Curated annotation (Swiss-Prot):
PROSITE patterns, A to Z: NPH3 (PS51649)
Entry comment, domain topic: The BTB/POZ domain mediates the interaction with some component of ubiquitin ligase complexes.
Residue ranges, compositional bias (Gly residues): 227-238, 736-747
Function, in words: May act as a substrate-specific adapter of an E3 ubiquitin-protein ligase complex (CUL3-RBX1-BTB) which mediates the ubiquitination and subsequent proteasomal degradation of target proteins. Plays a role as signal transduction component in coleoptile phototropism and lateral translocation of auxin.
The encoding gene: CPT1
InterPro entries (UniProt xref): NPH3/RPT2-like, NPH3_dom, SKP1/BTB/POZ_sf
Name this polypeptide is given: Coleoptile phototropism protein 1
Species this protein is from: Oryza sativa subsp. japonica (Rice)
Disordered, as annotated region: 1-29, 227-264, 460-495, 687-718, 731-762
Length: 762
């Protein structure tokens, strides 16, 4: 069993006694110090000997003595020597006060105070809050074993290795305190060792963790996210550190605290604790956890939890703005050393795109670093994080202008699971800044659909191919070989195909909803709409009602489209895939081209004819089969079929039939007028040609001469041909008696009729 040392070794923890070396013992005994006293911004030593060393650390002054400091600090020894050499001109150099400035000392005045207390032989209380700063200060002051045995570097290293790294909570607190100690904490491997310790404990079996961590709400452990102070004395330190049991029960463990009597913590017990870390330290922890082989879905859940704390805009209901209750503000207030990264994500809902970018210009570097770091550590496996989280992260990355390579990688990950997306997450504004830009980034959605199709094709190819690089199967039973039987392989391929079709259908519905939403934008060009609508294959949509709704919305928002553009727009949908309600709406839609309306009506007529044919065939088959008398009666006529349809169908069909009858009446009227005009032309031609072979009149002879010269006769013949082409459309109905018969038609008219009909056809 290994557990927090604050409870098992509380009497020895944190108390650093006077050094065991004899080099400075006589100086410490002569000083007769009673401790340090602070006055305003200065520290003094309670001693009978006057101070001869002034150390300035920032804006704090320390009035000390030379010999206790130079006996344990190599850097202090050199600094005092250089200061004394500068005062050689004075008569009594030994009595002069040496002034040493250490403005760049890691840990600041607090760490130097502890180092000075240690140099004077006072007991120093080591805690998880001050150990990292004191370790860096000891390295800065060069308090090595060469100066004195058991020096400060040795003791702080021992405390880190045997106390801090064995405790979960202390490792978190020390790593949090390292935020203000760069690059010293990095160079001394404190960050690496704490990250690996946290990763090792996070990957351990949860059954070895007692239910006593901050995520479960420890009672007296202090503020959540702050370091736990570990003081010497009894075992009542009150820390929130979890206890760990890696092999059976320990000797000092009570029955009440045995793992069998404790509830097993969930797999996400460590999410809340690591979420207080700064982004660079969180990346180090997650990287170490990946190396140790944790499940990618748990890693993705931890990243999502961390991002929801530091980037409130990534949650569905939270606004894209920081408040005073954000976790980074709590962490900086309860943590050690400051260094908390304050985030401010500005939403684009309150102003224009330029205002958003201007508001993000000041903290954009820190925000961009957080977003890019989260993108880089997100597991690449499918379903490691939700598609909604990826889309919201993509929105922030575009708004903050993250690295293009990371944005492209994030788009590919979204495309891998695009069928899981929601319309609200897909409506990403366009942050181009130009007035002609569309309200939403349509090009981004086009790229997401392309990534989705590429992923689908890759999965289909992998599922259908048997593996070219595999060795030939050995001559043994099939269940011993690593290959899948042909039947199983075919079943897997069919399952992959079915899943791909279902995913494409969901993406098609999502895309139709997206098109209906963005079609209201007047700046959306017809080309972009058409390309996005045709990005999916035809097999992805079983019904084009959603696409028709988007087309109708686009026509409503763009009333200035030409007839050619309307026809081009309507080509994106298939009239044969429209439902009955959509067909009835399209038949009465004045915004659609007339040709599309006719095509819709014809398609519906074909459907009705096919239904009648199938009903008749079913009736004949049922009548010929045995027991046909018991079969229900099937509709045999169109009237019977319409009587069995809903009332909405009958009303819509009646309106459409009324329009068709009106068109037929107008066509019959035009036929009658044409036949009347044709009769008058025949009568005029008879007058010109003469009757019964008599001598033509002078006027008729003149007209015949003009016909021979090809002057006015050509005009008559050209007019005749034009009218003949018009008669070509209705000649069959006129011949059948559907039109109005020409009044007074004689034998000559009947004789010349076939000739004129042939001319009209030619």
């Amino acid at each position: 069993m290994w557990e927090s040392e604050s409870e098992s070794h509380g009497g020895e923890r944190g108390l650093v006694p006077v050094g065991g070396g004899g080099g400075s013992g006589r100086h410490e005994a002569a000083l007769k110090n009673d401790g340090f006293v602070r006055r305003d911004r200065s520290w003094y030593v309670n001693s009978d000997i006057p101070s001869d060393l002034l150390v300035k650390v920032g804006d704090v002054n320390f009035y000390l003595h030379k010999y206790p400091m130079i006996s344990r600090s190599g850097r202090m020894s050199r600094a005092v020597y250089e200061s004394s050499a500068a005062d050689e001109a004075e008569a009594d150099a030994a009595a002069a006060v040496a002034v040493v400035e250490m403005g760049d000392l890691p840990g600041g005045a607090g760490s130097f105070e502890l180092a000075a207390r240690f140099s004077y032989g006072m007991a120093v209380d080591l805690t998880a809050a001050n150990i990292s700063g004191l370790r860096c200060a000891a390295e800065y002051l060069e308090m090595t074993e060469e100066m004195e045995e058991g020096n400060l570097i040795f003791k702080t290293e021992a405390f880190l290795s045997y106390v801090v790294l064995s405790s979960w909570r202390d490792s978190i607190a020390v790593l949090k305190s390292c935020e203000a100690l760069s690059p010293w904490a990095e160079n001394l491997q404190i960050v690496r060792r704490c990250s690996e310790s946290i990763a090792w404990k996070a990957c351990a079996n949860p059954r070895g963790v007692r239910w006593a961590y901050t995520g479960a709400g420890a009672g007296s452990g202090g503020a959540r996210g702050g370091p736990a102070a570990i003081r010497g004395g009894g075992g009542s330190g009150g820390t929130a550190s979890p206890r760990w049991n890696v092999g059976g029960g320990g000797g000092g463990e009570s029955k009440e605290s045995s793992p069998s009597r404790q509830a097993v913590p969930p797999a996400d017990w460590w999410f809340e604790d690591v979420s207080v870390l700064r982004i660079d330290h969180f990346v180090r922890v997650v990287t170490a956890i990946k190396v140790k082989g944790m499940r990618f879905d748990l890693i993705g859940a931890a990243i999502t939890h961390y991002a929801s704390k530091w980037l409130p805009g990534l949650t569905k209901d939270a606004p894209l703005g920081a408040t005073h209750d954000e976790p980074w503000a709590q962490a900086s207030a309860a943590g050690v050393g400051g260094g908390g990264l304050h985030m401010m994500i500005i939403s684009g809902a309150g102003g224009g795109k330029d205002d958003v970018l201007a508001a993000c210009s000041a903290p954009s570097r820190e925000q961009r670093m957080v977003v890019e770091s989260i993108i880089s550590i997100t597991p690449p496996q499918r379903d490691s994080v939700s598609c909604g989280f990826l889309l919201r992260l993509l929105r922030l990355a575009i708004m903050l202008r993250a690295a293009p390579a990371l944005v492209t990688e994030l788009e590919k990950r979204v495309g891998m699971q695009l069928e899981q997306a929601a319309l609200a997450d897909l409506l990403i504004p366009s942050y181009g800044g130009r007035a002609a830009d569309t309200a939403y980034d349509v090009d981004l959605v086009q790229r997401l659909v392309e990534h989705f199709l590429v992923q689908e094709q890759t999965e289909m190819a992998v599922a259908s191919s048997p593996g070219r690089g595999d060795p030939p199967p050995p001559p043994q039973p099939e269940y011993y070989s690593g290959r899948m039987p042909p039947s199983s392989a075919a079943a897997a391929s069919a399952s992959a195909s079915t899943g791909g079709l279902n995913a494409k259908a969901r993406v098609a519905r999502l895309l139709d909803s997206y098109l209906s939403e963005v079609s209201r934008d007047r700046n959306l060009s017809l080309t972009k709409f058409q390309v996005l609508a045709e990005s999916l294959p035809e097999s992805a949509r079983a019904c084009d009602d959603g696409l028709y709704r988007a087309v109708d919305s686009y026509l409503k928002a763009h009333p200035t489209l030409t007839e050619h553009e309307r026809k081009r727009l309507c080509r994106v949908m298939d009239c044969q895939k429209l439902s009955f309600d959509a067909c009835m709406h399209a038949a009465q839609n004045e915004r659609l081209p007339l040709r599309v309306v006719v095509q819709v009506l014809f398609t519906e007529q074909v459907k009705i004819s096919n239904a009648l044919a199938s009903s008749s065939a079913a009736l004949r088959s049922s009548s010929s089969a045995p027991g046909a008398d018991a079969a229900p009666a099937m509709p045999t006529t169109r009237r019977q079929l319409l009587d069995g349809t809903p009332q909405s169908f009958q009303e819509g069909w009646a309106a459409a039939k009324k329009d068709i009858n009106t068109l037929k009446f107008e066509l019959e009227s035009m036929k009658a007028k044409y036949l009347e005009l044709q009769h008058e032309m025949d009568a005029l031609q008879k007058q010109v040609d003469g009757r019964g072979g008599g001598a033509p009149s002078p006027a008729a002879a003149k007209i015949g001469k003009q016909q021979q010269q090809g002057t006015s006769a050509s005009a008559w013949s050209s007019g005749w041909k034009k009218l003949g082409r018009l008669a070509k459309m209705s000649g069959a109905d006129a011949a059948a008696g559907g039109g109005v018969a020409p009044p007074g038609g004689g034998e000559a008219a009947a004789r010349k009729g076939p000739r004129r009909w042939r001319n009209s056809i030619s």
